[in-house]
Amino acid sequence: MSQQTTPAEQKSLQRKKPPFRADQVGSLLRSEPVKKARLQKAAGEMTAEQLRQIENDEIIRIVEKQKETGLNVVTDGEFRRAWWHFDFLENLDGVEPFTPEQGIQFHNVQTKARGIKVTGDIDFSTHPMLEDYSFLHSIAGDATPKMTIPSPNMLFFRGKLEKDEYKNDYQLFQHDVSKAYKKAIQAFYDRGCRYLQLDDTAWAVFLSEKGLKQIEAFGTTPDELRQLFAKSINDAIADRPDDLTVTMHICRGNFQSTWTAEGGYDAAAETIFDGLNLDGLFLEYDDSRSGGFEPLRYVKRSDLQLVLGLVTSKFGELENPDDVKRRIEEASRYVSLDQLCLSPQCGFASTEEGNKLTEEQQWAKLRHVVEIANDVWK
């Protein structure tokens, strides 16, 4: 790397707490046993208990596979979910699932139809994913288990507001959502969670002309929405325990190796990099759609970790490690190398369909991340 480090600084490059030098976003390709069991459950050929046992067995297997790649962090691959966001959001108080007329439009492909609507007061009383985390925690061993949930902004971005008080008062809606999330974060912490990630595609609306039209349809302005999104997150994570790491993954969409949005971080950079009280940010940087590293100049905090998603999860071909290292060096011109980490740009299966690569290619990608990180931060 271009920056010279002293022995003391070099020692600090070996991070003992998350996010780690080699990290991952979270979702993994659903295995064939899980896919088959889900179909059997839907057809009435399997009980919920039988499905959960198969999920348990497969999660145990993939946790070990993650460890074999050299990662210090493990997830359950989101194996119990169909969607990265809806499964969590529809189990909040005041939220219900529904079937819209069409799915979400991605680049040349559309998801199956699924939506959520806000019909009552938003709150958090309990949630099935608490048990999901407890199982992961029980099998993680020496690795750090990470829980991934959608950002509070996703309820605004993807939720159909049917409660009149919320439709007429976004500030009230934000207040109640953040309050519910604050309870959720504490509930996961009480189950032993010390590494929580918020996944967020809502920030992509600021990054393109298409997104700006969406903001106009919301009846607000970009400045107002940036402030609302930032307050939603900051209020939700305020006063969190000192030993809880909370990061956010900013995504431009990830469905069957396609995307929904493109554009650099410039239009929301000051808010993202200097307005959120998070411990780390997972940033997509796997191709030209994500722009350059110049927006990192807005980073003011020396304790904010930036996890560069320079390895794509959309395709199986491995990146040239020298190219990845060169890009890390480029990023280090704007922030200290000590503040940088490496991961895939997104999960491998944000929905149960998964991206277009094999499971072995997935593990190879994660090994690739670990090997490159070990070379850079050695």
UniProtKB/Swiss-Prot annotation:
Polar residues bias (residue ranges): 1-11
- Gene from which this protein is expressed: yxjG
| MF (Gene Ontology) | 5-methyltetrahydropteroyltriglutamate-homocysteine S-methyltransferase activity; zinc ion binding
Annotated segments matching region Disordered: 1-33
Q: Which GO terms describe its biological process?
A: methionine biosynthetic process
Gene3D superfamilies per record? 3.20.20.210
Which family does the record assign? Answer: To B.subtilis YxjH.
InterPro entries found in the cross-reference section: Met_Synth_C/arc (IPR002629), UROD/MetE-like_sf (IPR038071)
Descriptive protein name = Uncharacterized protein YxjG
Coiled coil residues, start to end? none
Tell me the Pfam families matching this sequence: Meth_synt_2 (PF01717)
NCBIfam families (alphabetical): PRK06520.1
